[in-house]
């Protein structure tokens, strides 16, 4: 059973937890940007639950309208690159990394210096990939316990398990977006997967789901079972293991 909200649970006492939350923004011109519907509510709820469980918590946040939980250190960023830099800065000494942010996968190669005018019927934007923050942390040595999120519109389990294995995560929390779930909503439902197991967290308020997720993370962290960071690096860069 979940501990009541606000209880003095110490499941994460003495641990440093680093969380990303919210969306990122990638500038097109001075007045336009590419972003997504993430409200940051789930990431902030996880931060609150981890703090209530006794952890030292740092949250690296994209632009959101969510209050910072008491006792949580907040680092505000805007772009995926800024989020990556902030995560790198706070990663040393981190025991658990939880990637709850909805990070832009692409960014404009050359943002316009001035507002783009309507001069034609179409507009082509050259885009480049942003750094994969989750994969980068998963390949770090020494490596924290790495938890990813998978927000999917279809084939949730298949896509989540593919991400779990492909990025060699310790755990992934998956949910289907839409139908008043996940993005910009107060409720959520998650299926949590790890190598060899899973746990359902049924639909409830995000704070309750977050408390359940933190409980599962603490249980798995306590087992001492970890996925190898060396393998994660070799997956991202074939031949790395031979260096």
Regions found by a protein language model. Give the residues of each.
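Solvent-exposed alpha-helices and their adjacent loops that cap or buttress functional pockets
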Residues: 8-12, 66-68, 89-91, 138-140, ...
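A glycine- and small/hydrophobic-rich beta-loop-beta segment
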Residues: 63, 71-135
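Glycine-rich phosphate/nucleotide-binding loop
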Residues: 106-207, 212-243
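Glycine-rich phosphate/diphosphate-binding loop of Rossmann-like nucleotide-binding domains
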Residues: 13-79, 91
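Internal gly/pro-rich beta-alpha loop/helix module
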Residues: 1-6
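Short, well-ordered coil/turn residues at beta-beta hairpins
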Residues: 20-21, 100, 175
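Flexible, glycine/charged-enriched surface loops at secondary-structure junctions
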Residues: 9-14, 60, 223-231
């Amino acid at each position: 059973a979940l501990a009541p909200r606000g209880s003095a649970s110490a499941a994460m006492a003495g641990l440093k937890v680093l969380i990303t939350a919210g969306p990122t923004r990638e500038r097109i011109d001075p007045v336009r940007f590419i972003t997504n519907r993430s409200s940051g509510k789930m990431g902030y709820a996880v931060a609150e639950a981890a703090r209530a469980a006794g952890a030292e918590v740092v949250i690296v946040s994209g632009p959101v309208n969510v209050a910072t939980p008491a006792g949580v250190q907040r680092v505000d960023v805007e772009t995926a690159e800024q989020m990556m830099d902030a995560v790198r800065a706070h990663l040393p000494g981190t025991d658990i990394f939880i990637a709850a942010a909805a990070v832009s996968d692409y960014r404009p190669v050359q943002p316009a210096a001035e507002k783009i005018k309507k001069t034609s019927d179409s507009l082509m934007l050259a885009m480049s990939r942003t750094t994969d923050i989750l994969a980068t942390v998963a390949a770090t040595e020494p490596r924290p316990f790495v938890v990813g999120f998978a927000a999917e519109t279809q084939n949730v389990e298949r896509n989540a398990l593919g991400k779990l294995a492909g990025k060699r995560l310790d755990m992934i929390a998956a949910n289907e977006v839409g139908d008043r779930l996940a993005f910009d909503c107060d409720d959520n439902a998650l299926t949590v997967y790890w190598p060899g197991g899973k746990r359902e967290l049924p639909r409830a308020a995000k704070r309750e789901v977050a408390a359940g997720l933190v409980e599962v993370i603490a249980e798995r962290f306590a087992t001492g079972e970890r996925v190898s960071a060396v393998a994660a690096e070799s997956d991202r860069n074939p031949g790395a293991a031979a260096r």
